[in-house]
Amino acid sequence: EVMTRLRYPKDFAKRVVWLVSRHMRFAPMMFTKERTLTRWVRTEAAGGEFRTSKDLTEAFSQLKEVFLADMGATHAGNNPQLMAEGRELADAVIEIARNKMPVHTADLAVNGADLAQIITDGAETGIFLKYLLERVRSGNLPNERAALLEAAKHRQQKTTAKAES
């Protein structure tokens, strides 16, 4: 609300609110494993705040800077090892966002044209893409063209078999 009154652009204000509301999330993550980090990034990717993986990665890069500045303002600022651990943690989260967490179906290694050869009902293309997106986000499927096409073929076979029953 303050950002709006000060006439900052809406997207900028939303990003500032996102950064402020999440900058303390990093601290407890220093004691967790990659699965917890992945779950956090997955939640943010699916939350509707970001349109692309690039936006998500940019936001986490900015969050890293806020987190490190916050750490530097505390006793951790005098502890180079602790600051290095914080930097490594933030880099790990950015890496997950950049390489393992698609935000939108457009971030997948396949598109509707690729699936047209597999799907018998073109109206279901969006459903298949969302299915593949969820599989990649969950870590059950790599975001690689061959793996996605194989998963789509398998899903189409199951759908066809179910319809024939």
Task: Report the location of each language-model feature.
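Charged substrate- and nucleic-acid-binding regions of tRNA-handling and nucleotidyl-transfer enzymes
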Residues: T74-S165
